C-alpha cells in the first residue's frame, strides 16, 4: 500500500504462486519494474502478466542475477517464503528498502541475520490480512478493486470444489506447483 511504486524495482518471490501471480499484476498496474522468480517453464506466463524479468528460483547465483537487473538493489520485495530466502533478501535490497513478508510456510522459525538487515536499514512489513485494521484493509480492497475494474487484474483459478469436498480442496491448497487459487463453491 505504499503511496507510489511507479518506476520502483520490485522483487516478487514465487511469481507463479497465487500471491505472486496477483502481486505481479498489481505492481505492474501501479507502474513498477518487476523481477520475479519461478521455474523456467513459467517464464512466458509471468511475462504475459507483467513481469519484466523472470529468474530461476533454484539458481545458486540468484542474488547476483537480481542485482544485474537492479544494480542499486530493489526498492521493495514481496516475500512468500521468508525463511527460505532470509539470507538472500538483504543482498538484493537497496538501503532503506521494504520487504513485505506474506509467508514462510517452509521455515516458520528461521535464524535471523539481524546485522545484514540492520546495516541496510531494511524495513520488514509482515502482512497478515486477518490482523489488518479495517481502515488499512479497506484501502487494500480499493486498490484491488480499481485494478480489477480496469482490467489489470486476472485472478488465476486452479480448481473449484463443492463444499462436500472441502477436505480435498484443502489437500490441493497444500500441493506445490498449482496454478492459482482453490475455490469452494457454496
Regions found by a protein language model. Name each.
Residues 14-15, 81, 104:
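NAD(P)H cofactor-binding loop motif with strongest signal on the N-terminal glycine-rich segment
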Residues 55, 75-78, 100:
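N-terminal Rossmann-like NAD(P) cofactor-binding module of classical short-chain dehydrogenase/reductase
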Residues 84-152, 186:
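Glycine-rich phosphate-binding loop and adjacent beta-alpha segment
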Residues 135-186:
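C-terminal hydrophobic helical "lid"/dimerization subdomain
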Amino acid at each position: 500500500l505504499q503511496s507510489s511504486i511507479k518506476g520502483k524495482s520490485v522483487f516478487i518471490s514465487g511469481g507463479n504462486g497465487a500471491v505472486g501471480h496477483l502481486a505481479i499484476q498489481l505492481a505492474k498496474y501501479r507502474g513498477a519494474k518487476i523481477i520475479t522468480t519461478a521455474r523456467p517453464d513459467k517464464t512466458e506466463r509471468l511475462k504475459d502478466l507483467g513481469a519484466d524479468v523472470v529468474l530461476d528460483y533454484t539458481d545458486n547465483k540468484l542474488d547476483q542475477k537480481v542485482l544485474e537487473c537492479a544494480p542499486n538493489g530493489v526498492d521493495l520485495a514481496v516475500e512468500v517464503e521468508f525463511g527460505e530466502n532470509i539470507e538472500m533478501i538483504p543482498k538484493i535490497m537497496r538501503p532503506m528498502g521494504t520487504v513485505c513478508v506474506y509467508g514462510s510456510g517452509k521455515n516458520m522459525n528461521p535464524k535471523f541475520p539481524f546485522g545484514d538487515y540492520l546495516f541496510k536499514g531494511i524495513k520488514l512489513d509482515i502482512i497478515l490480512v486477518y490482523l489488518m485494521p479495517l481502515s488499512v484493509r479497506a484501502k487494500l480492497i480499493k486498490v484491488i478493486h480499481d485494478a480489477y475494474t480496469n482490467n489489470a487484474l486476472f485472478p488465476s483459478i486452479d480448481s473449484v470444489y463443492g463444499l462436500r469436498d472441502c477436505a480435498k480442496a484443502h489437500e490441493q491448497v497444500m500441493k506445490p506447483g498449482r496454478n492459482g487459487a482453490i475455490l469452494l463453491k457454496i
